[in-house]
From Swiss-Prot:
GO biological process terms, semicolon-separated: segmentation
One cellular component (GO) term of this entry: nucleus
Protein name, as recorded: Protein krueppel
Subcellular location: Nucleus
Function description: Krueppel is a gap class segmentation protein.
Domain of life, per lineage: Eukaryota
Gene3D superfamilies for this protein: Classic Zinc Finger
GO molecular function: DNA-binding transcription factor activity, RNA polymerase II-specific; RNA polymerase II cis-regulatory region sequence-specific DNA binding; zinc ion binding
Residues annotated as transmembrane: none
Length: 46
């Protein structure tokens, strides 16, 4: 129901972004940490 109410309880401590789902916050935090958990299947890059 948060989607319909506009409630965004999960916020980033590095910037001013807020999220409805904690999974979206975790994905966003990779922007700040530089984490790249998935590797390319065609080359050795991440």
């Amino acid at each position: 129901m948060r989607l319909h109410t506009g409630e965004k309880p999960y916020h980033c401590f590095h910037c001013d972004r807020h999220f409805v789902q904690v999974a979206n916050l975790r994905r966003h935090l990779r922007v700040h940490t530089g984490e790249r958990p998935y590797s390319c299947t065609l080359c050795p890059s991440r």
